From Swiss-Prot:
Record SUPFAM superfamilies: Nucleic acid-binding proteins (SSF50249)
Name of the protein: Small ribosomal subunit protein uS12cz/uS12cy
Gene transcribed to yield this protein: rps12-A
One matching Pfam family: Ribosom_S12_S23
Major location category of this protein: plastid
HAMAP family in the record: Ribosomal_uS12_B
Record PROSITE patterns: RIBOSOMAL_S12
Length: 123
């Protein structure tokens, strides 16, 4: 506990909150271009080949973004929309690609949770 004299000498500093998605620069989403599309393996208890893309954003950042859903059409030079949101078992992946916008098509034959994967209501 500081004394009054110590508090006069230097005041209490406010706690600075650090953003979890700095590349978005305070925006809800950002547009970017895929520079590389590849798969990586998750952390220890899990096992899979997770689809990710290296994306150069309009803010100038180069980030790794997760491609959600089963199957995708993304390749190099695809223009995508990126939102925040990490993938817990992929270290360094702090962004998601938004399906159903720009060059990323929605997931084929998706019936439930369609809004998260950019799928229109089936007829």
């Amino acid at each position: 506990m500081p004394t009054i004299k110590q508090l006069i000498r230097n005041t209490r500093q406010p706690v600075r909150n650090v953003t979890k998605s700095p590349a978005l620069r305070g925006c809800p989403q950002r547009r970017g271009t895929c520079t590389r599309v590849y798969t990586i393996t998750p952390k220890k208890p899990n096992s899979a080949l997770r689809k990710v893309a290296r994306v150069r954003l309009t803010s100038g950042f180069e980030i790794t973004a997760y491609i959600p859903g089963i199957g995708h059409n993304l390749q190099e030079h695809s223009v995508v929309l990126v939102r925040g949101g990490r993938v817990k078992d992929l270290p360094g992946v702090r962004y998601h690609i938004v399906r159903g916008t720009l060059d990323a098509v929605g997931v084929k034959d998706r019936q439930q949770g369609r809004s998260k994967y950019g799928v229109k209501k089936p007829k």
